[in-house]
Amino acid sequence: MMLSMAACGNGAEEKETENSAGTEAQAAGGESTLVYGSNDYTRINPAMDEHGEINILIFSGLTSHDGENQVAPGLAKSWDYDEDTLTYTFHLEENVKWHDGEPFTADDVKFTIEAIMDPDNGSENAPNYEDVTAIDVIDDHTISFTLSAPNVAFLDYMTMAILPKHLLEGEDMQESDFFRHPIGTGPYKLDSWDAGQAITLVKNEDYFKGAPNIDKIIFKIVPDDNAKAIQMQSGELDLALLTPKDAKTFADQDGYTCYDMKTSDYRGILYNFNNDYWTANKDIIPAINYAIDRQAIIDAVLLGQGMTAYGPLQRNIYNNENVEHYDYDPEKSKEILEA
């Protein structure tokens, strides 16, 4: 099943909740600060393995996603695709600076993607770029990628955070201290990191798309989902990503706003094909699949905040609804077992 989240805030299908009262009180003091209930981070290394909300605040990709989850410009203001040569050419924004003041160029892009592709670096993102056969820097603000085959998801993959070559060249891409003191091109800069307690970001006045409205964002480390809901209620948090059950508590409360949003979070019951049992009894697998009421699980566990999945990919613009799948059909399951 694909999980839908909700974000709720004090004044998400997982819900994000916003607490308007807390933020307004801080804004009245002159500096606007948002306190977000976050899971913990051991490092901030989007190119190798980390997935977190903090990445898109500190870093930028060549592309981004808009409010409808469609591909939009990022560090690349535009791009072209040559169907004959399977080549994407990206035209980069000019006058973009890293948080340390150094200029961003196409060399940073080439460095980042090649670092991800390098098997010695052990990046879990490497499979996204296995079709790339050549990366050519045309000039400081133009770069091309040639593929071995068409890849409909390539522009999505280019949302990958770009890293600064001048700070990471020659560094260990897994162990470098950079990933505890990251420098990006994003709308926020790292201000402080109190391990296990909070990560504080301040707005980047030189952000190439314009300085953000909120002056400071505090990622308060609250790993427990229940604790996030409690701290939303007490006003200790302004924003949190909550489970559907917890988000429902805030949906109708004055002073709170909940935002439903789709995620790529995936949950499934998988077969262990290393076990000889499934090799010997593979004929019963369809029967098991037909016997599982996925929608009932979504309704009971996620309060309906999710959708049935046919595989690990999102049912979005790339989805093929005609792919073979097993809808809930207990009678068909019984027929297979009795055959």
PLM regions with names:
Residues 1-33, 70-73, 133-134, 330:
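Short, low-complexity disordered leader/linker segments with a strong preference
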Residues 37-81, 114, 183:
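N-terminal lobe/hinge region of extracytoplasmic solute-binding protein
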Residues 66, 159-211, 216, 331-335:
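Gly/Pro-rich hinge or "lid" segments in bacterial periplasmic/extracellular proteins
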Residues 80, 84, 126-168:
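Surface-exposed binding/hinge segments that line
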